[in-house]
Regions:
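Fe-S ferredoxin-like electron-transfer domains
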Residues: 29-173
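A basic, amphipathic helix-loop patch mediating RNA/tRNA/ribosome contacts
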Residues: 2-36
Length: 173
């Protein structure tokens, strides 16, 4: 789509220039599109194009779905944009502005404070994690360490080393 000038928003996709690695987990669902002949919306990052495929990227249904997905992600995210170091350079903040999200219609799960961990090579603040899985892709496919993965389920899901160990105790470089 971007090759022909169509902007489809995404949070989980990352194209690591200079490598053959692409992160297309379809985990964020911000990139949903309508595909003719399909009942459900499809994630653009994980949908292979075929000859004659008709894809609609900005219908009312698509835009409403993207806004709801952004609202759901924000519902489980700290409301501290003004004090966040990424303020003004944050993809999630940009999407909230794009979809004119001013109030939170959803309340995320009641979670206890999540881990914040700093090592010599990485700062890991799980309060900011939106489960895009970019870090997992870089760890597994670029660094080829395999130290990170999704553990637990539902609101308890987190991206962490096996058995929820600390990064300093893992194979992380």
């Amino acid at each position: 789509a971007c090759k022909i000038g169509i902007n489809i928003p995404t949070l989980c996709h990352i194209d690591l220039k200079g490598t053959c690695i692409k992160n297309n987990p379809a985990s964020c669902r911000i990139c949903v599109v309508e595909v003719a002949g399909r009942r459900n919306l499809a994630p653009a990052c994980a949908t292979r194009c075929t000859e004659g495929m008709v894809v609609k990227t900005s219908t009312l249904r698509v835009m409403n779905a993207r806004k709801v997905v952004a609202e759901l992600i924000l519902s489980d995210h700290p409301n501290d944009c003004l004090t966040c170091p990424k303020c003004g350079n944050c993809e999630l903040q940009t999407l909230a502005l794009r979809f004119n999200i001013r109030e939170m219609p959803f309340n995320g799960g009641e979670l206890s404070p999540r881990k914040r961990e700093v090592t010599s090579s990485i700062v890991r603040n799980m309060d900011k994690c939106i489960f895009c899985r970019r870090c997992e892709s870089v760890c597994n496919d670029v660094q080829t360490v395999g130290a990170l993965g999704a553990i637990r389920r539902g609101f308890n899901t987190t991206i962490a080393p096996a058995f929820d160990r600390m990064m300093k105790d893992s194979e992380c470089t």
